[in-house]
């Protein structure tokens, strides 16, 4: 929604709390650039209203207020890997993103050689139970750089995911979002978890082409975004809906 018009009342000074509350609902338009732009044609993510980012330690020290004005209306922040690794920038990013008025959530990179319940406990230990946060995310993909070379069967994958997601949903009271990439989805997730929201990576084609028949909540459309407020490249994402639908979804999930 548009920012409140204050020019007509130059003598009035809003209290910081009121100004912050008003500003938090504002949607900033997309001003990101892309080092490797893709022409999505009529299915361009730019036609959608609510854009955001996902970040980790690789983005370094982020100027969150500046990033927000570039169009980061939401951010998913890397929190944990496996059962014993915490992203060193998580706590700082978690705090400063909220201070900047950005709707933010945390994500966990799942390790296939670790027990699912241990990973859930590690995430819960490190990610605050903030009622304003977006639903937590489980990031499931194949990692060629991992020391864990054994790939579980599709059934084992889904069983591990279910244990992890059930534990998080009980703790945070919000159904987790599943983030995935095309190869992992094809191997393990086609037709599964139809009652969970999906966040889909599709950087060359629209998700409807890469994941036919799969409804999606978020689309990661670029891994080469450029923005003021961040020195390195950044992942760009968009919410599947209008600005009004975004606010309704936030109300529904309690964020």
Report the location of each language-model feature.
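Flexible, glycine-rich phosphate/dinucleotide-binding loops
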Residues: 84, 113, 185, 207, ...
